[in-house]
């Protein structure tokens, strides 16, 4: 399991990040959608997904 940092901008152009532990990037996005209502409502808002070392 690896740590992923996901980032996005909301409708006010404010920058946000969330960290998720997952086996791959797809699972990290799935967890983020479950944890953050904005990502769930706007599934294509993610700017970056970075796998941390």
Language model: regions and residue ranges:
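Short aromatic-glycine-(Arg/Gly/Cys) micro-motifs in beta-strand/loop hairpins
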Residues: 1-16
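Intrinsically disordered/low-complexity terminal segments and short unstructured peptides
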Residues: 1-4, 22, 47
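Generic alpha-helical structural signal
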Residues: 3, 27-28
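Serine/threonine-rich, low-complexity intrinsically disordered segments
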Residues: 7, 25, 50-52
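Helix-coil modules at protein/domain termini and other flexible surface or pore-lining loops
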Residues: 8-11, 30, 37
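A short, exposed loop/beta-hairpin motif centered on an aromatic-Gly-Thr core
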Residues: 13-27
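Short, mixed-charge low-complexity intrinsically disordered segments
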Residues: 15, 33-53
């Amino acid at each position: 399991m690896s740590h992923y940092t996901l980032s996005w901008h909301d409708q006010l152009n404010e920058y946000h990040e969330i960290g998720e532990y997952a086996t791959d990037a797809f699972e990290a996005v799935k967890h983020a959608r479950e944890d953050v209502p904005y990502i769930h409502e706007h599934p294509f808002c993610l700017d970056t997904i970075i796998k941390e070392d």
